Amino acid sequence: MKHKLMTSTIASLMFVAGAAVAADPTPVSVSGGTIHFEGKLVNAACAVSTKSADQTVTLGQYRTASFTAIGNTTAQVPFSIVLNDCDPKVAANAAVAFSGQADNTNPNLLAVSSADNSTTATGVGIEILDNTSSPLKPDGATFSAKQSLVEGTNTLRFTARYKATAAATTPGQANADATFIMKYE
């Protein structure tokens, strides 16, 4: 009899323990973070594609020995600015101007810098060229050649490259940031 009582007690305890495990857990809510939504409504002939509004152009890695004279350049690296929902009845042409920290030696180039306390390369700047291979001074006022707009999506093509500002360069990071403005006519 003692054995039956003990067996039934153990069975009851196992049932209660199983029921406790099987019960629905109490919901818990915790803060998960913040989501920032950004955008802009524009009264213009086109809207700049979100992919074009914030992009990175990778110029690559080059040996300092490649720069032996002022004006030496690297290969041109293409990039583009895509315009969406264009209405050529509002404006027939689009042009772009870039703005950024100009190089002290050659103000037609972007000055290079580094991030995270890395060493900055010297003796080079970054040159931006439009679709006619004309250099664009990063002053926010030198516009690219006008490009005719068609209805819908338009792609404005540019290139960038390193250009020597000295006969000798030193190694390091060679980064730059530029903003751009659109002009519709």
Swiss-Prot record:
Q: Which GO terms describe its biological process?
A: cell adhesion involved in single-species biofilm formation
User: Which locations, inside or outside the cell, does it occupy?
Assistant: Fimbrium
Query: What is the first-listed, main subcellular location in coarse terms?
Result: other
**The UniProt record lists the keyword Signal:** yes
What cystine pairs are annotated? 46-86
Coiled-coil segments on the chain, per record? none
Pfam families, alphabetized: Fimbrial
- Check the record and name the InterPro entries matching this protein: Adhesion_dom_fimbrial, Adhesion_dom_fimbrial_sf, Adhesion_dom_sf, Bact_Fimbrial_Adh_Pro
Q: Where is the signal peptide?
A: 1-22
Query: What's a single GO CC term here?
Result: pilus
Q: Which UniProt keywords apply?
A: Disulfide bond, Fimbrium, Signal
* Family affiliation: Belongs to the fimbrial protein family.
Q: What does this protein do?
A: Fimbriae (also called pili), polar filaments radiating from the surface of the bacterium to a length of 0.5-1.5 micrometers and numbering 100-300 per cell, enable bacteria to colonize the epithelium of specific host organs.
Q: What is the protein's name according to its record?
A: Type-1 fimbrial protein, A chain
Instruction: Please report the organism this UniProt entry assigns to the protein.
Output: Salmonella typhimurium (strain LT2 / SGSC1412 / ATCC 700720)
Taxonomic lineage from the root: Bacteria, Pseudomonadati, Pseudomonadota, Gammaproteobacteria, Enterobacterales
